[in-house]
């Protein structure tokens, strides 16, 4: 199963990179056939993906960081395919990004809705761990769930370096048959189902959970490395998925 998943991830992302299809006709999926956007009622996600309206492309996906005129090994990175957006089935998803290894650096994470209204913001100082972080949007009473088929833009800022990266996230429905199959699946099978359905954010979250649950199993680290390389995030792929 893992070998098949790796093959699907690499081949589909490679196709997306080479063919340069316009943004509104690309779905950042793993092993599904891309459908043209439907400006009517959006379809639900199943193993064959979904149609959805076009969404504005956000800002930069990667920004190099320099300290004492030396470029750091890993750039500030939004962990997304080259198209810079992805899908989730979660009302409160987890969003992944990579910050460079500078301890004590302020990080500002912001999430805005389609009207550019601030939905959630948090600030923190980096520690001594170096890797790709998954930041969950908390299900607090004052934070509304993501609305279906609305484009939300998230931004990670490093004020110290005057640098920021952004990505788009769109929440979609899944079909009843998908939900039933997902509920009965093992952790590894769920990873495959999420990849097949093109749910980028949820696939990464599932992979990170597998890596945390089985830190001594190298296949999850290897798969993360291949995903990062296929998404043209080669430098961050050598660092752990936290």
Range-by-range predicted roles:
Residues 206-207:
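Inward-facing hydrophobic residues that define packing positions of alpha-helical scaffold repeats
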Residues 2-14:
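Bacterial N-terminal signal peptides that target proteins for export
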Residues 82-101:
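Contiguous beta-strand segments within globular domains
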Residues 11-23:
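Bacterial N-terminal signal peptides
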Residues 97, 132-170:
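Extracytoplasmic/surface-exposed domains of secreted proteins
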Residues 118-131:
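Solvent-exposed serine/threonine-rich low-complexity stretches and specific carbohydrate-binding patches
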Residues 210, 214-217, 221-242:
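Preference for solvent-exposed, low-hydrophobicity sequence contexts
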Residues 32-46, 51-58, 62, 75, ...:
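Extended, polar beta-sheet/loop recognition surfaces of beta-rich domains
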